Amino acid sequence: MKRTYQPSTTRRKRTHGFLVRMKTRGGRAVIAARRAKGRKRLAV
């Protein structure tokens, strides 16, 4: 059986990257929440 996590940098960036987050209102909310919390990494 193949494992579920098959890492791919391209796919990772395209689905969870900063620019993708900034596209939608919800994504911007995620970034804002992470900024407020003081996260070192805002997005992948």
Curated annotation (Swiss-Prot):
Gene3D superfamilies (UniProt xref): 1.10.287.3980
A GO molecular-function descriptor: structural constituent of ribosome
Short name of any one Pfam family annotated for the protein: Ribosomal_L34
Highest taxon above the source species: Bacteria
UniProt KW keywords: Ribonucleoprotein, Ribosomal protein
Entry-linked InterPro entries: Ribosomal_bL34 (IPR000271), Ribosomal_bL34_CS (IPR020939)
A cellular component term, taken from the record's GO annotations: ribonucleoprotein complex
GO biological process: translation
Family matches, as PANTHER family: LARGE RIBOSOMAL SUBUNIT PROTEIN BL34M (PTHR14503:SF4), MITOCHONDRIAL RIBOSOMAL PROTEIN 34 FAMILY MEMBER (PTHR14503)
Family recorded in the similarity comment: Belongs to the bacterial ribosomal protein bL34 family.
Protein name (record): Large ribosomal subunit protein bL34
